[in-house]
Amino acid sequence: GFFPDVGATHFLSRLDDIGVYLALTGEQISSSDALYLDLIDYHVPSDKLEALQQALINEPNLSKQNIEHIVACFITRPAESELKPLADGIRKHFGFQHVDEIEHSLVQEQDEQLRPWAEKMLSILQQRSSIAKQTSLKLQHLGRGLSLAQCMQLERDLQDIWFDHGDFIEG
């Protein structure tokens, strides 16, 4: 088990309960979800990235206005966020201060539409290392009050300790 790093303490903590959900479960998000969460400003399909890069390389004057114009030519609207319909359920269950409260809340889910999702999330959490879950949750709470530089340093310091004494699986 490990914890989200590479600045995740900073950017996930700004997503409140949804950030806690992502940190604890390790669920991946799509570009649609990233747009919904305001983690990105634009969606450019991966098959258009090379053309965007070439357009930027070919532009002799990379002013802010020209860059915005070039990027605008490649922006598309992705599919609807899969995370958006789960947001209320995520807030309901992942807003607690302790992992055991989150897990208990998921067990107690009565909404028939949310129950399969809650059971899946509980199963994921129960497979995770206890120390990794507790650490990830604590980092999300601490990160809300720290700068990016402070979060990066905290993650670095914790990594050093983790590799020496943590619950880290090599492979």
Predicted regions located by residue number:
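CoA-thioester-processing core
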Residues: 1-19, 35-37, 52-56
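C-terminal alpha-helix plus adjacent terminal tail
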Residues: 29-32, 47-171
